[in-house]
Amino acid sequence: HKHRRRQRQMCIRDSTWELDETKICLEMRKLKEMVALGAPDDHIEMNFNEDSGVLTLNLGKIDRNVRPLDPSTISPPTLPGLDFGCKVKLGGAEFSQSLKAARQVGDLVNFSVDPKKFTVHVQGSTDSVTVEFDSAELQSLECDKPSRSQYSLTYLLPLSKVFGNLESVELAFGDNFPLSMSFAFYDGAAEVKYFLAPRIESDL
């Protein structure tokens, strides 16, 4: 469906590496395969040879040579200029748990917010799940007016593994509005902004 589109952007601060500025485009699949070989505390070192045009990924005794993609064939994501009416910041573990609970009942989750609370709700054919956070339980809450929007858990649930280890996740949305999720990890070395289009009644 056209309303299921999603976008991601990640920024890694230059304090995490030593290099001369260059632009390299890689297939995420290949990086994921390499990362999967390591333990949580392992480091991957990347070295790019401009003469050969080959990037070497080193993990312990493993060296993998990767041929980068042609940058001219890559279209960078266009971040939408959206005016979000509501913003909520909460602990990553709490948000992760609410998504996992929601998935036990259905495929679509409703986020609703007003000046006093943020609610995660799923209504299934026989069961329902509601997770409510009062403003005092949230790290921050900004809301001009009550808003509600529905999103697919197909895209949200895989992120719950990431959210569980985060100190905070910032959500921004409005009535039947795209969802923006912003978070940082590794002590702020990397910042991610993820956009997910809403599911509206005409989609169902």
Please place each PLM-identified region on the residue numbering.
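Single conserved hydrophobic/aromatic residue that forms the stacking wall/gate
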Residues: 1-12
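Beta-strand residues in well-ordered beta-sheet regions across diverse protein folds
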Residues: 56-58, 112, 121-123, 172, ...
